């Protein structure tokens, strides 16, 4: 097996703990890799005024594949106030380093699969006929456009004259906001491009074909956000009709989708959405399979081969200073499995997933979230497994 070089990006908070344990699992499963660490996150914002240093971008450019832990992100003013006076004088403005990575490398295809593990005590259940308890199997692949939309970062408070003048050419803006003083206005734009929209839609349909899903659902809000959401649904209709007639195309509004996923989640296969709605609906489905401790993701650009794999949870800084790490590493480990599949290490990915499934089903080792505890330092004393113990239990399954 060729030895791979992987850029590890621990980031902030719990990112280091889950990534360290994930790498132990990869090593024990037989993945032959060398890891180089990239600097990213809040520490480097405070030290250097840049949470995504150029040296880290260069590392990823060179090695192509990254495993990412988590980052802390704070509002603009809070971030500015944590800088030294010397850095504050430079007029620096904080921006999320993970968003920066997506935009710099064009990581516009985000896949967030949500699959339930048998025996997970956090799985979604409902009442069926005759008051019976049902636990539907959830297996949904959510494709999120990762670089555009409301997360694109094109926004202003007290917009400059050119922007304000352009907005005033729109009759609805002029009617509803024209009398509002410009200094009282903040604007965040929602920009969709046809090229990026087509790429994410085709990625969703290709995934449905490859893994035998029967439907692709566009989850947007075209009845209100007519231009951007409308463009996505119209383009999906055209693409499905021309190239994927064997796959059903469904359309749901994001608000209705959040209701329906708690009623009949098993009917959905592949879902495709813009940046913000993809973020929302994937967290909704993650709640049905155990929460963010089980939610993984891949962010890829097929054109340049660069890919970043990360759990969808945040850095949870309140847990980072506990004497023993208590967080669930499965989301990070699942993200690594997605990485293995991406680089054609299918056998190792399957081996790890089988071990995770056995540990979850067996139920002997459970982190605090799986035991429905509040995340406090004393959960270990009350029977919850630590991050390290969960990883060790998975590794022990390789030896069985």
Identify the role of each PLM range.
Residues 22, 26, 236, 332-340, ...:
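Buried hydrophobic packing segments
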Residues 5-29, 164-254:
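Glycine-rich phosphate/diphosphate-binding loop of Rossmann-like nucleotide-binding domains
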Residues 32-57, 259-261:
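N-terminal beta-loop-helix "entrance" segment that forms/cooperates
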Residues 34-37, 211-220, 244-251, 345-353, ...:
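Flexible, glycine/charged-enriched surface loops at secondary-structure junctions
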Residues 92-95, 261-364:
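Glycine-rich phosphate/nucleotide-binding loop
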Residues 46-173, 276:
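N-terminal glycine-rich phosphate/adenylate-binding segment common to multiple enzyme folds
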Residues 39-45, 228-271, 275, 279-280, ...:
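Active-site rim loops that border cofactor/substrate pockets in soluble metabolic enzymes
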Residues 12-15, 64, 143, 204, ...:
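Buried hydrophobic positions in well-ordered alpha/beta secondary-structure cores of metabolic enzymes
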């Amino acid at each position: 097996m060729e030895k791979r070089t992987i850029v590890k990006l621990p980031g902030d908070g719990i990112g280091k703990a889950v990534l360290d344990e994930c790498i132990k699992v990869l090593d024990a499963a037989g993945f032959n890799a060398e890891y180089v660490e990239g600097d990213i996150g809040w520490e480097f914002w405070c030290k250097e005024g840049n949470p995504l240093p150029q040296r880290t971008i260069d590392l990823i450019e060179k090695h192509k594949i990254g495993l990412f832990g988590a980052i802390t992100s704070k509002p603009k003013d809070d971030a500015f106030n944590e800088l030294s006076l010397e850095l504050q004088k430079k007029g620096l403005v904080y921006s999320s380093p993970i968003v920066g990575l997506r935009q710099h490398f064009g990581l516009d295809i985000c896949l967030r699969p949500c699959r339930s593990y048998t025996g997970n005590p956090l799985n979604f259940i409902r009442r069926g006929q005759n008051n019976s308890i049902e636990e539907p199997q959830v297996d949904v692949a959510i494709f999120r456009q990762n670089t555009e939309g409301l997360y694109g970062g094109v926004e202003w408070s007290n917009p400059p004259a050119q922007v304000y003048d352009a907005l005033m050419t729109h009759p609805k803006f002029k009617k509803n906001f024209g009398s509002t003083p410009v200094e009282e206005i903040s604007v965040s734009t929602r920009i969709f491009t046809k090229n990026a929209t087509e790429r994410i839609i085709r990625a969703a349909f290709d995934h449905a074909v490859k893994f035998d899903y029967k439907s692709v659902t566009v989850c947007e809000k075209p009845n209100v956000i007519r231009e951007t959401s409308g463009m996505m649904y119209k383009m999906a209709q055209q693409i499905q009709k021309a190239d994927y007639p064997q796959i059903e195309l469904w359309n749901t509004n994001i608000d209705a989708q959040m209701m329906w996923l708690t009623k009949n989640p098993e009917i959905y296969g592949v879902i495709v959405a813009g940046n913000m709605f993809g973020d929302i609906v994937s967290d909704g489905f993650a709640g049905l399979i155990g929460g963010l401790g089980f939610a993984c993701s891949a962010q890829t650009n097929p054109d340049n081969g660069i890919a970043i794999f990360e759990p969808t949870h945040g850095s949870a800084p309140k847990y980072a200073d506990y004497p023993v790490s208590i967080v669930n590493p499965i989301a990070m480990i699942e993200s690594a499995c997605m990485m293995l599949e991406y680089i054609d290490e299918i056998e190792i990915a399957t081996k790890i997933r089988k071990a995770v499934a056995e540990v979850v089903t067996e139920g002997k080792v459970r982190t605090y979230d799986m035991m429905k505890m509040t995340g406090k330092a004393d959960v270990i004393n009350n029977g919850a497994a630590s991050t390290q113990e969960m990883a060790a239990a998975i590794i022990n399954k390789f030896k069985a």
